[in-house]
Design a protein with these regions (language model features):
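PLP-dependent amino-acid enzyme catalytic core
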Residues: 1-334
Length: 334
């Protein structure tokens, strides 16, 4: 009997699910990261950052952790803080999904809401959040783990996610994921390319994000991406990326709804992005005699998006429902 003794042991070693498509020359694998205890791949981030801070002596029992997050990192830190005896405050803003905020509270975490007017230095709200997290940590003798620039973040994905993917799909040809702090793809991508330089790494961001384009605009996708005008994280390593591209709110959200209703997979917005893009990418590729193996990082569960992407009224109000996208998905994912 495989009995675990603490929450830490539940992080990682997530399953891979193969799903069929109309293209018999492709094998499509989903790395289901929502099997982590707090429900996303950011459990790996929290685990790596907290372990490194404890080992260095920066984080000690009874201290409070302050972190800027749109939701999943904060959920993971709140969970591990509760398990390890730390206090935790998430620095959030008005754009954070209510479902994620409720989860943070459920783990005993506190919320500090930032506004555009809070910091006299101005700048984008993401930068305001990041500065607020550092300021609160300094004022209270707490700790800001800084998921954006802390090299332990991509290192954690290198040591775990990259290794697991290679063990589960040794002859992988493509890895597709979304990019926010850049840590998951930078870390796992490095690991894969060290073992097979021919593996292609594709990074996706929401249409409107500014990782690879200075011209950004607003979007509803809440996990990946980076708003125009915000200071980009240092953890993004573009040298391992073979391609970058964009997926719209409409494409991601309708894909989420399709997989919930027709495949029994309740996935989040970044997962909707990779599932839609995989279809688009494969359909544009010529038929091959070789079997191509593609792994998609399914970052989190759709349970954190019930109030918007899975809410009919919200989707209608934002004019995001699209029957053609659903039809295309049904024809590809058999």
């Amino acid at each position: 009997m495989n009995i675990k003794r603490n929450i830490d042991e539940l992080i990682g070693n997530t399953p891979i699910l193969e799903i069929p498509t109309v293209r018999t020359d492709w094998e499509l694998y989903l790395k289901l990261e929502y099997f982590n205890p707090a429900g996303s791949f950011k459990d790996r981030t929290a685990y790596a950052l907290m372990n490194a801070a404890e080992k260095s002596g920066k984080l000690k029992k009874g201290m409070e952790i302050f972190e800027s997050s749109s939701g999943n990192t904060a959920k993971a830190l709140a969970m591990l803080s509760a398990a390890r005896g730390y206090k935790f405050t998430a620095i959030v803003d008005k754009h954070a999904p209510a479902d994620k905020l409720n989860s943070i509270r459920a783990y005993g975490g506190k919320l500090h809401f930032c506004t555009d007017e809070e910091d006299p230095k101005g700048g984008h709200l993401v930068d305001v959040r990041r500065r607020a997290a550092k300021k609160l940590a300094e004022e209270t003798n707490g700790v800001n783990l800084d998921q954006y620039d802390n090299p332990e973040n991509p290192k954690g994905f290198y040591n775990t996610l990259g290794k697991e993917i290679l063990e589960q799909v040794p002859d992988i040809d493509y890895l597709i994921g979304t990019i926010g702090t850049g840590s998951s793809l930078s870390g796992s991508g490095h690991y894969l390319k060290e073992h097979n330089k021919d593996v292609k790494i594709i990074a996706l961001e929401p249409k409107g994000s500014s990782h690879f384009s200075p011209r950004g605009h607003g979007y509803f996708i809440s996990g990946p991406g980076y708003p125009a005008g915000a200071i980009l994280p240092k953890n993004i390593d573009t040298t391992i990326l073979d391609k970058n591209d964009y997926v719209s709110d409409k494409e991601a959200f309708n894909t989420m709804r399709f997989f919930g209703e027709h495949k029994g997979l309740l996935v989040g917005d970044s997962s909707g992005m990779v599932l839609y893009y995989a279809m688009k990418f494969i359909k544009e590729e010529p038929v091959s005699e070789k079997i191509n193996k593609m792994v998609l990082i399914i970052s989190d569960s759709g349970e954190s998006y019930l109030s918007h992407a899975f809410n009919d009224s919200w989707m209608i109000e934002k004019e995001l429902l699209d029957k053609q996208i659903t039809k295309d998905l049904a024809e590809f994912y058999i």
